Amino acid sequence: RDARMSGCDHPGLLPMEAALERLLALAEATPVEQVEQVALAEADGRVLAEPLIAALDLPPWANSAMDGYALRLADWSGQALPISQRIQAGAAPTPLQPGTCARIFTGAPLPEGADTVEMQENVELDEAGRVHFREPLKVGQNVRAQGQETRIGECVLPVGARLGPIELGLAASLGAARLAVRRRLRVAVLSTGDELVEPGQALGPGQIYNSNRRLLIAWLQRLGCSVVDAGILPDDLQRTREALGALGEVDLILSTGGVSVGEADFLGMALREAGELALWKLAIKPGKPLTFGHYQGVPVIGLPGNPASTLVTFGLLARPYMLRRLGVQRVEPLGFMVPAGFAWSCCLPNHHLARRKQLGSYHR
């Protein structure tokens, strides 16, 4: 629900929809424009930079949808028909002889002159090898017409389409060996906090294992990003400045932790020094604090340090921002009307997301 329409305002809290709108506008102002030609085998997860236009009809010729017998319906008036040829997938049939039928298999091209296929379960063969059709027939039954799925010249995938198994299979069916895609988004990932320790190391007093960076790197790789692992930053302003300054070649710096208004908010301090910081308190739980700014011209998104908050804000806000920079238009998270599983109160943030272990999934 939009806080502007809910009658339950939260002063100082930005509705998630408004935050997403701002992020998408910022993304559109700095699109990734470089284009690469990549082989289909390397295109999974990439974003199409040029429309995919059908270079042939699909199917390229009329073919049988069933194992059965192909005939010209005008030749049949209830009599048995002799078999004049046998057609398998990949064969080049000859024109159908008048008054005959052809044994045909699924996917095989229909012979010239045939317009109907009867499935093999509905026929009988007599001792002479002639075919008896036991049921009424209709012109075009069990036939996949040429161009039934796609016509030559049609745009089958638009600019900005994300390429996955279905899209790549479609491109292959049209004979495309390479596709024009946006270059990968270069994203640096860092975590902040003296309390963080890498998995496998011994924990000291007050320390926790760093899970957020591994979560984000895995998700970014699935999005097709080129990831720079910038490690863990201690709570030190000078070290933060140095780390951010060394990442000038990336398209985005994605950090977790250090986005509060406390004394240890060294990421925010560094961005304030650069003069480009927006600290948004979102009407969402988990995930209230979110930082967006620039450091020496490089966009920076600061996510909360709590793992649940990191997961939610990345999925709802950072991920759409990155996809929009690559030209993807449909980036908004899908919404579903489902039971909330908790009592609504005006003291709650505008979006309250319950954990999976409580409700089986995240609910809005």
Which positions does each model-derived feature cover?
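Residue-level signal for inorganic ion chemistry
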Residues: L23, G68, G153, V189, ...
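Intrinsically disordered, low-complexity, positively charged segments
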Residues: P11-A80
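Short, glycine/charged-enriched hinge/interface segments at domain edges or termini
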Residues: A3-M16, A70-D229, S361
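Flexible glycine/proline-rich
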Residues: E17-L20, V32-A41, G45, A49-E50, ...
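Structural signal for hydrophobic packing residues in well-ordered secondary-structure cores
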Residues: L24-P31, P51, L73, L110, ...
